[in-house]
Amino acid sequence: MEKSKGLVTIPTDLDVVPQTLELMKLWGADAIRDCDGTDFPTELKDADAEIYSTYYTTRKDNAWAEANPEEIQQMYVMTPFYTAESETLEVEVMKGLYPDMLKPNTRDDIKRWWEVIDRTTGEVVPTDKWDYSEETGKVTLAAVPFHEYTVSFLAYIMWDPVHMYNAVTNDWKDVEHQITFDVRQPKTHEYTMKRLRKFIEDHPYVNVLRFTTFFHQFTLIFDELAREKYVDWYGYSASVSPYILEQFEKEVGYKFRAEYIIDQGYYNNQYRIPSKEYQDFQAFQRREVAKIVKEMVDITHECGKKAMMFLGDHWIGTEPFMEEFKTLGLDAVVGSVGNGSTLRLISDIDGVKYTEGRLLPYFFPDVFHEGGDPVKEARYNWVTARRAIL
């Protein structure tokens, strides 16, 4: 019986070239890709396969981010609830958060973009009743004894959450923290288009650009011990900046409040009924993200390459089942098959030439370790995916 070939993509790295070639033959793979933290081997550039290159639009360029700190991406974060025991309350805004990941934004007007709320009454504390000290990292406010208070603040994303997750999970030592820059802002937008063209020019052997992903990370926050503190795959709280919010205000005709994102600390998770303001913001984000994605996809096609999107990571604003997705012009979507429902989420996408499921487990030490059983996990993942296909 003749062995078939095609519709299988395999990952590679510099030190596994013979194994990559062996698996290509064994599995009939027709595509090879690099991964976060790996490099594509020169020996495989002429392999009989399509070559995918993972492309990061918002990170892996700290020189640019550090030279343009005002265009680093930001997110809204809320402190825990604190009970006032007297008429003065101090709130340490970064308490319980990983210090290397976030940095409070004091560059922009904090009295405009931050918000202190009396959660007992639901009232906003007037801006003349509180102050922030950069030296102590604390907000000091005039309080009503035994009322509960929170501070909602903007913070720069100084360590990309996905890069941090990969570094922590793989125990990467002495790795430079990749800063997340904001492609929506003018200087970075212009630079990004030039950077994309240069990347394609420098990698002529690449057939498919695997955008991972585009501009805004889903909500992913780590605690002070580098553990996942809050995760929402659909969260928009890391898609904000005064630049973006001022554009939004011009479109909708009303002032933006931090609470539209914070939502009493629920961050508008998928179990909440969204407010009109939050829905307005999501619609605005999808439209604005779609414009720049289309620009990047057009450049990719102009240079003779295919454009593939990873379903996840910085995917906010590119949700495949919304109207704007059809305007992006993507060739393909790839996603991680966590279970049957995520497989169907990927396979049912319209408006692309093909979809691709990345089967688990990751080649990470949480599975690939002494006593681990990656075969068991792989088999379970495959059986679950097959059930969804059938």
Predicted feature residues:
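Glycan-processing catalytic domains of CAZymes
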Residues: 1-390
